[in-house]
Amino acid sequence: LHQSKDPNTNKSTQEYTRELIARHVSGRLKVAPEHTSDRVLNIMRKPPFSQFGEFKKIFDRINHEEGLRQQLIPYFISSHPGCKEEDMAELAVITKRLDFHLEQVQDFTPTPMTVATEAWYTGFHPYTLEPVFSAKTQREKLAQRQFFFWYKPEERRNIINELRRIGPVSYTHLTLPT
């Protein structure tokens, strides 16, 4: 995934990744990309989502080469500081494109001594002092959380209403079930 300047390290990393996927996954590998928005991931102090995409390609390729039918199970968070409804709509589009029906999800829970909790509590990023939006009310949290479940017919009407509310942004790739 992360290419170093040392070819031996890169080779060792590839061998380790293949060994992990081919020999040490018992059907499902749970990973935590946590979000698709690079802006939100930056606040989380995590790498860009493209790195997860690269890993998924490697995972799928090794599964195909080894004749395996394993699943990659991603874990995502809604209502994280910096996350808005538009980010969650985009998350729905991306996870649909990747053919994920999300189940491993959670709303952000503030925990002591973290950058995210500081931003959530104060409304400012502690390092940059830039304002940071945080969903705090039940309505704001549900407005974000529903996008995890774009594939559920019972969520269709609420998601469409939320897309209309957030404005002119087009999410034409998010074809909801009827």
Language-model features: locations:
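Active-site-adjacent helix-turn-beta-strand microarchitecture at beta-sheet edges
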Residues: V105
